[in-house]
Regions:
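N-terminal Rossmann-like NAD(P)+-binding domain of SDR-like oxidoreductases, especially those catalyzing
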Residues: 4-157
Length: 157
């Protein structure tokens, strides 16, 4: 009688650049992903502004699947170096200036982060994921833009 050995399937680790994860929504996403998946790496890029708090990530401290990088999504060199080092499969952007009262007082910061920072992430992803010579995109790469803001004024009738 011959026994057939089943080959052990190896999972390919998926690598995520996740921005703004010291905030409420981003930190909950980190906890969710690390609880649900064993074979992932989350590289968390966060500037740690008024909206971010490292205390939100206390529970994942020391988890080898989570790497925290303090930095700005507007920093072209930093973002490019992270793409080069980790060869991300996914980018999920939670980073944003999101308080309406602050946007009125200082709109330039909002435009810089919410518009130019997002453009920077998209450009670095394009550089990493698009082969201009063959005019093809690397398979399976994804970018997700998450956007929230406060609601103000009267709603509905």
């Amino acid at each position: 009688m011959m026994l057939k050995m089943k080959k052990k399937e190896t999972q390919i680790m998926k690598k995520y650049l996740v921005t703004g994860c010291a905030g409420f929504i981003g930190s909950n996403f980190v906890y969710y992903m690390l609880k649900k998946y064993d074979d992932i790496l989350l590289v968390n890029l966060d500037k740690l502004t008024y909206a971010g708090n490292l205390e939100n990530l206390k529970g994942v401290e020391g988890d080898p699947r989570h790497v925290f990088v303090q930095g700005d999504i507007c920093d072209k060199e930093l973002v490019a170096s992270l793409f080069e080092k980790y060869d991300f499969d996914y980018v999920i952007n939670f980073a944003a200036e999101s308080h309406v009262d602050r946007s009125i007082a200082n709109p330039e910061i909002f435009v810089q982060t919410n518009v130019m920072g997002t453009v920077n992430l998209l450009q670095r992803a394009k550089e990493a994921w698009y082969d201009a010579a063959t005019k093809t995109w690397k398979e399976g790469k994804k970018y997700l833009q998450v956007s929230t803001d406060e609601v103000y004024g009267a709603l509905g009738a």
